[in-house]
């Protein structure tokens, strides 16, 4: 009887010890629970509860009190973590721009302005240099620079091969000469009486042209007058 009583007392003490071990982290006055932060305490408590729940379910004869205790603990943790998750995150205030950022922004603005001015100058220069210009080839000292044709003489200019002035040679040159000005200067004294009056307007009348008979007559008159005006010689 005595041995049985001792054995029963020992079994009661063994049952109390696991309960004390399992319930110490539920006491908020415990030093380990009080020193731990709320988030760390909740996470550690949740991990321990889940671990004990799985351990109890793996046993062949699970303890009902232990399961109820673990489930209540999990519900309490879930209720305490729900308001914290429901609260929206507090937006952090925007950081004030530092002096280095202001300097970088000003330097970037100055650099962009200088680049824009350089691009405008380059586009202006490209617009001016769009017309192709012949390159100056370097040749002997006697040769003109830039591919210019050498100086031609008068005969070379008149020649048909050059094509500078004429294409038909000297005959075309004489055909193109207008001799009317020379005729007017030659017969100007004789034809003064035939000139029209002063020009009154833009529609002036041209001087009548003289035919060959009139020219011969004028020549005879001029020759006769010159003979009459010539003084006789001393022997006559």
UniProtKB/Swiss-Prot annotation:
List, alphabetically, the InterPro entries matched: E2F-SERTA_domain_protein (IPR052262), SERTA_dom (IPR009263)
Compositional bias per record (Basic and acidic residues), positions renumbered to this chain = 197-207
**What post-translational events are described?**
Polyubiquitinated, which promotes proteasomal degradation.
Task: Please list the disulfide bridges.
Answer: none
Output the GO biological process annotations, alphabetical, semicolon-separated. Answer: positive regulation of cell population proliferation; positive regulation of transcription by RNA polymerase II; regulation of cyclin-dependent protein serine/threonine kinase activity
Q: Keywords on this record?
A: Transcription, Transcription regulation, Ubl conjugation
Pfam families listed in its UniProt record:
SERTA
Protein's name in the database: SERTA domain-containing protein 1
The record lists the organism as Homo sapiens (Human)
Q: Which gene encodes it?
A: SERTAD1
